[in-house]
């Protein structure tokens, strides 16, 4: 189970890994915010689906919630309940979520609730460059060059964010 607060988080943090393991194991990706309240991001949800499909995921492996961006702390209980539903439905062996060193309020809430919801399950944190502070991983997962290239291709589908520094190929390749 891969969980991210916003469209692009999962791809930024785990895109190469997803590309490497898709088709070899059961996968499910849950993005908690659709960002629909921001008129500048009107195409973001479509870009997210295209990006995830580029990584090899099917639409039935992708779910997007409607929690409002920057308001996750206000909906902590509802987020926890959604995670408990996912736990019952999917029975994941491993959960990927934002690193505990992330400072974005939505990412912090998601990680804290994941640690509560998935007690007894391996929960691993991934880095999203633009919002983590002091990220010192306990271990790294090796990914293939093909996986990295697929991550870069997938993130190129986000025309909304094309000019942001963390979407440059050099930055994506190094993260």
Kindly label every feature range from the protein language model.
Residues 1-124, 130, 171:
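Active-site beta-strand->loop->alpha-helix modules in alpha/beta enzyme cores, enriched
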Residues 55, 59, 89, 94, ...:
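The feature marks non-catalytic terminal segments
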């Amino acid at each position: 189970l891969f969980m991210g607060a916003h469209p692009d988080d999962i791809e930024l943090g785990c895109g190469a890994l997803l590309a490497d393991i898709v088709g070899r194991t059961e996968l499910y990706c849950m993005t908690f915010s659709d960002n629909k309240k921001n008129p500048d991001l009107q195409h973001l949800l479509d870009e997210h689906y295209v990006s995830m499909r580029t990584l090899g995921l099917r639409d039935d492996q992708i779910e997007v919630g409607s929690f409002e961006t920057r308001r996750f702390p206000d909906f902590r209980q509802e987020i926890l309940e959604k995670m408990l539903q996912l736990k019952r439905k999917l029975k994941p062996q491993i959960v990927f979520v934002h690193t505990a060193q992330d400072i974005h309020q939505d990412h912090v809430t998601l990680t804290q609730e994941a640690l509560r919801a998935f007690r007894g399950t391996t929960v691993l944190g991934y880095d999203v460059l633009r919002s983590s502070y002091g990220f010192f991983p306990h271990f790294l997962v090796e990914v293939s060059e093909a996986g990295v290239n697929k991550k870069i291709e997938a993130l190129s589908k986000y025309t909304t964010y094309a000019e942001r520094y963390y979407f440059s190929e050099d930055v994506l390749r190094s993260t």
